[in-house]
């Protein structure tokens, strides 16, 4: 981010991340990886260019070889957005074959694209025609396979690389948390009867952008009866006195790191007994579950040790009990016992992983729900909590 003083050595973070990617490629005996996903591209080289637009238009891509020069095929074909980056060795104009720009020539453009990739890979000593791709049009995959390439899942590579954060990454994440919590403070000040959900949600956006942040992934703010069931998006509903207001930030802040925390408040009133009851259970879910995290514990062991949830709250439980986070929500996802057989996948918690611990508490058919979430770093001794915006402990 230009015109800022970073809290750490950005080039050290950049090289750490690139080396993590290359280590995962090495483990899988891959020649390299082609990245179209904008957050994977950000992780591997830290070059940004219209990230949201390029997330739904395959207009820029990155080739990271296991050995050899990293090539960024950037929209516009210029280097103004990656000057001085130690992670990018060459800039080229992209060969785009998405329909908006290629029209009826998309098949021919895909053929040209594959020939170009083949030419680049053919210059590398490690050329074995095993390559990973994170996301792209099936036509591009077909063209590479026609040239004899074996295509592997790029998300396995990238999620594995992104799993362990460096000290520098944690410093950048703490900056994102700082900006997010300042913006939450702006929301709290703006919360008065009559303000719409959207106007309140806009305060989070305003604080994030003004503080150097980038975007917000979702629209998860709801009030009163719109909180239960969860996942209704922010609306033009005026918030009323005494309403529960619940929100989930999903905020991509400064330097591209995510602050994913949730809070629930009452608008201009003291909570009633039912609101206190819901809040207390959500609070204890967070407190009891976050301390389970430590290096070496398996995902299944975490699932089996989660705080039991009363039957009335089970139907409205959140989709996961906790999940990883970095530039966005990341691997792993840890599920509730009720969901393990269908969705569970095992693994091991490691030092350096950052996890978000979730709680969503609302009775089936009840008026409101409480959403709480904290972001924590797994350390050698347990956890360091990264989020610190106060909870409503006086309601307990």
Where are these regions (language model features)?
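Active-site neighborhoods and metal-handling regions in enzymes and metal-associated proteins
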Residues: 1-396
């Amino acid at each position: 981010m230009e015109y800022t003083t970073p809290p750490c050595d950005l080039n050290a973070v950049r090289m750490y991340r690139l080396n993590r990617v290359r280590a995962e490629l090495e483990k899988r005996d891959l020649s390299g990886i082609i990245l179209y996903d904008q957050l994977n591209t950000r992780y591997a080289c830290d070059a940004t260019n219209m990230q949201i637009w390029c997330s739904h238009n395959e207009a820029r891509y990155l080739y990271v070889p296991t050995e050899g020069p990293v090539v960024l095929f950037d929209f516009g074909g210029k280097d103004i957005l990656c000057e001085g980056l130690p992670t990018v060795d060459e800039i080229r104009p992209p060969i785009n074959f998405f329909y908006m720009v290629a029209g009826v020539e998309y098949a021919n453009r895909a053929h040209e694209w594959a020939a170009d990739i083949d030419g680049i890979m053919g210059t590398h000593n490690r050329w074995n025609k095993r390559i990973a791709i994170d996301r792209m049009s099936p036509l591009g995959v077909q063209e590479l396979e026609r040239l004899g390439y074996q295509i592997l899942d790029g998300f396995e590579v990238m999620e594995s690389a992104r799993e362990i954060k460096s000290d520098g990454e944690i410093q950048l994440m703490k900056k994102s948390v700082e900006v997010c919590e300042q913006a939450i403070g702006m929301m709290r000040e703006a919360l008065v009867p009559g303000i719409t959900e959207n106007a309140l949600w806009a305060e989070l956006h305003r604080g994030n952008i003004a503080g150097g942040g980038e975007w917000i992934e979702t629209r998860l703010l709801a009030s009163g009866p719109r909180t239960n069931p969860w996942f209704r998006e922010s609306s033009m509903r005026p918030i009323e006195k005494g309403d529960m207001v619940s929100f989930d930030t999903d905020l991509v802040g400064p330097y591209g790191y995510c602050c994913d925390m949730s809070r629930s408040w009452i608008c201009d009133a003291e909570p009633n007994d039912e609101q206190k009851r819901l809040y207390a259970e959500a609070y204890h879910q967070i407190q009891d579950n976050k301390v389970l995290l430590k290096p070496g514990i398996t995902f299944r062991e975490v699932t089996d040790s989660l705080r039991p949830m009363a039957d009335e709250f089970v139907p409205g439980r959140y989709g996961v009990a906790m999940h990883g986070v970095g530039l966005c929500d990341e691997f792993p996802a840890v599920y509730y016992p009720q969901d393990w057989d269908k969705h569970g996948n095992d693994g091991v918690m490691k030092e350096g992983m950052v996890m978000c611990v979730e709680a969503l508490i609302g009775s089936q058919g009840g008026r409101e729900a409480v959403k709480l979430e904290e972001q924590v770093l797994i350390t050698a001794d347990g956890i360091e909590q990264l989020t610190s915006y106060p909870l409503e402990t006086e309601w307990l």
